[in-house]
Structures are given as structure tokens and as C-alpha cells.
Amino acid sequence: LSIRRQRQMCIRDRLRGNRPGADAGTPRLLRSDRPNVVLILLESFGRTIMDETVNGEPVMPNMQRFKREGVWFENFFANSFRTDRGQVAVLCGFPAQTTMSIMKLPRKSATLPSLARSLGREGYRSAFMYGGDLNFTNQASFMYSTGWEKLIWQKDMQLDAPTSKWGYADDVVVDLFGDEVEALGREEQPFLAGLLTLSSHEPFEVPFAKFDDKLLNAMAFSDAQIGRLIDRLRESPVWDNLLVVLVADHGYPYPYDLAYNAPLRHRIPMIWLGGALATASRTVDTYASQIDICATLLAQMGLPHDEFDYSKNIFGATPPHKFGYYCFSDGFGVIDADGETVYDNTGETVLSQTGPQSERLEWGKAMLQTTYEDIGRR
């Protein structure tokens, strides 16, 4: 990337989420400093699909319901187009890469800061569940090395239920996950519980028949299971001190002609729900992306996030200019309230730019170059 080192470091320093005063002015969204946290990664839940209707019927009625009930992040973006890179962004606040995945480099990924490790220092237990194979893309090694205590996946479940290409369908897995959350809630320690769904992954094989389009039908199935899970937890004693974070692992190219590098391809939902919230039915318009979850959540709990260089507190005072950032195959996009810039690094070409001239191009170059230099040092 053709950006001078001194200028790059100056820009990068301005974009750091852990600068002094980063949490100044942060509004309090939680009733408790130590809520139990449920973090659900929703496979391929692109924003365009969430907003879709078929003959007037919403594809994701439960997500639409939760959007109205909880804290809704209107301008939120995935950092990548793959689950493994999205997981690292959400769980470690570390930016995705264009042509590699740090998750597959265990000695390097083990050095990343992580939400599980930060909460573990505060006495939190942690458990993560997935209905498929957590050895895929080295997920299990990554999860253990970044502080998750307990992993539950397909090999542990041994269910009398059919499996798809990727594992057990979401309907049976959310029931097990509900059991796990309620069991953790009966213990004295606070907890962090994570779930990665899978039924909305292609080839979209689900025990469900609502829409003719296989993609939309699978998305509707997963939405229905998340709706059942949230409604179950709402009726459980665990709900009173529970914060549920619903966020996609990445988006999906829908409509089917949506360009792979378009900002809309990477726009995803994020919703906060639960009895631990002091506020509800709130819309957050700030531009942000998956890497900002760690700092935002830790700041709400009054905990430090100094380790997370790239993660910005969405509600904090610094950096003053908030934006969403994503990577595609050797390129990046930066989106803020003024417009968007999409850059192809291979061709050294700005593919699209809207809004007034800004520093978005330099921000993106600094983020991408700094990410790779950081990985090289680990």
C-alpha cells in the first residue's frame, strides 16, 4: 500500500479505540455492571435478507420484532465475508484480513486480546456451542487459546437427529443451548455463553418449508429458532440479569446480483436484548463494525479495553469520527455518515466513492497495512 510510514502511523493513532478518554460521555445502557452475556453469531444473516419480504410476509419476523424491542444498531457492518474472520473480529476485536485468516495461525491468534479472557479475569465462566465441527478452520484451538473454558460441538452432542452437511440443525441446537444458559444461570459465577448457528449456511438444507427460495427458506428457519430461544430465555429466571447480543458472522450476496465488494453486501444486523438492559426500543445510528463490539461491551460494564487497539467504543468520545470497515479479497471498504469508499488493492483503484472528499481512503489503507504488520510481529 502506497502510504508513507509516518503518515500511516499518525492516522492509525487517531483511529485507535483505546486512546485516553475513549469512554468519556458513554451513556449507560445496562442496569448491572456484571450482566450474564449471551453472544449469538448468526450464520450469513445479511441485512438485505433481514429486510426482505415475500408477498408481504417478512423473511425474518423475529429479528424484526427484536429490532423494535431492543437496542438496534442501524449502520453496522461485518469485517469480512467468512465465518472464521468474523469470529475473530467479534470475539477479539481484531480486523479481518483480505487474503488470509489469523485463526489458522494458532501461535499468532493465541496472542490476541479476547472478550472471553477479559471477562475471565472478572470471574466469568465461559462456554461456546456449535452444532458442527469446531475443528474446521482451527476454531477449537482458537477458542481455547483465547480464553473460552468449555466448547460443546457436534461430537459432544450425539443426538438422535438428522444432520446436514455442516452438522445438527438449529432447532435441536438452540434447545441444548437454552439448557446450557439456564444451567450456567443457576451457578454463582457470572457467565459468557456463545452460540454459532449453522442452518442458514449453504446448501440451505433445513427441515422447513415456508418459502420456495432455498436461501430465504433457510434464513426463515434460523430466524424461527432464534425466536424460540429468546422467548424461552425471556420466561426463565436467567433473563433478569441477561444481556443477549445478536450479530451476524458476515453478510450474504442478496439480491443475488449484489457485488461481492459492495458495502451493502457487508451490512449486517446487531441487536442487544435482555433484562440487563436499562433502555430498550432504542436505535443507534453510529457507523461501526464487528471489531467494535469488544470495546463497546466492556465499556458498558465499566471494564478496561486497553488491549483492544482496533476496537472502538461505539458510544465513546474518541475517536471522534466513527466508521464501518470491511475487507474482501484484497480490498477494503470504509463507510461513515458522509459516504463510502471501496478500494481494490490489487489494481490500486478506487472502485466506488460517494459523499464529500474525506480521509476514508487513507483510513482504510492504514487499517489494512497496520493489521498485516501487527500479525507479522506476533
Question: What function would you assign to each model-found segment?
Answer:
Residues 13-378:
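Solvent-exposed soluble domains appended to multi-pass membrane proteins
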Residues 1-11:
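Single conserved hydrophobic/aromatic residue that forms the stacking wall/gate
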